[in-house]
Design a protein with these regions (language model features):
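Active-site glycine- and acidic-residue-rich loops that bind
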Residues: 56-70
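Active-site metal-binding loops of divalent metal-dependent hydrolases
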Residues: 16, 39, 61-62, 87
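Mid-to-C-terminal alpha-helical segments outside catalytic/metal-binding sites
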Residues: 4, 103-139
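Conserved beta-strand positions in the central sheet of alpha/beta enzyme cores
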Residues: 13, 36, 58-59, 82
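Short acidic/histidine-rich active-site segments
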Residues: 79-98
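Short amphipathic alpha-helices and their capping/turn segments at secondary-structure boundaries
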Residues: 68-78
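Hydrophobic alpha-helical segments typical of transmembrane helices
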Residues: 46, 68-69, 108, 127
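Divalent metal-binding pocket/active-site signature
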Residues: 1-53, 71, 96, 100, ...
Length: 139
């Protein structure tokens, strides 16, 4: 899959739960312009590699309640962040068993704007711009 993405100049979205260090090393072997670590669950130790390689990371509703993820987000530049919901999943931690869907995106962006000390409007524009760059990089 990575070889095909490299040859076709396609972006890739990678779910690397519990294997992030290994996956980063594998991805670095390819010349793929846009890599997204979807549902990023890495820590501060992984962030340097993410930043050095201009990889994107995305965060979902876990950003609303996970202190570890909030701490991690503080170290990632806004220009490398995307948001998502990856549903349907049940988030009993903060939404009383509501299934995730795009209606949660404004809450995620609001939380991100609070963490980054930026206006909601600025963060929305940046997330939109990041998304366009990620998807259209090869065009």
């Amino acid at each position: 899959m990575l070889e095909y993405a490299e040859k076709q100049c396609l972006p890739v979205s990678i779910h690397s739960r519990n294997s992030l260090s290994d996956v980063i090393e594998i991805v670095k072997e390819y010349d793929i312009k846009n890599v997204l670590f979807h549902w990023f669950d890495g820590d501060v130790n992984h962030i340097k590699q993410i930043i050095d390689n201009n990889y994107y990371v995305s965060f979902g509703p876990v950003l609303l309640y996970s202190k570890r993820i909030i701490k991690t987000v503080n170290h990632i530049p806004l220009n490398l962040i995307l948001v998502e919901t990856d549903g349907p999943l049940n988030y009993s931690n903060c939404f009383k068993s509501v299934l995730s869907s795009p209606f949660l995106l404004p809450s995620i962006i609001f939380r991100l704007s609070y963490i980054k000390h930026k206006s909601f409007h600025i963060v929305c524009e940046k997330i939109f711009s990041n998304t366009i760059k990620y998807v259209n990089h090869s065009f």
